[in-house]
Amino acid sequence: DVDETHTLGHXFXEL
């Protein structure tokens, strides 16, 4: 489940 971590980081960044 490494993709989940990347998605969270991207979302935060985007926000």
Swiss-Prot record:
The keyword Cytoplasm does not apply. GO terms for molecular function: lipid binding; metal ion binding. One of its GO terms (cellular component) is extracellular region. It is found in: Secreted. It comes from the Eukaryota. Plasma. Coiled coil: none annotated. Keywords: Lipid-binding, Metal-binding, Secreted. Its main location: secreted. In the red-eared slider turtle, there are two forms of albumin, ALB-1 and ALB-2. Belongs to the ALB/AFP/VDB family. Serum albumin, the main protein of plasma, has a good binding capacity for water, Ca(2+), Na(+), K(+), fatty acids, hormones, bilirubin and drugs. Its main function is the regulation of the colloidal osmotic pressure of blood. This is 68 kDa serum albumin. The lineage of its organism: Eukaryota, Metazoa, Chordata, Craniata, Vertebrata.
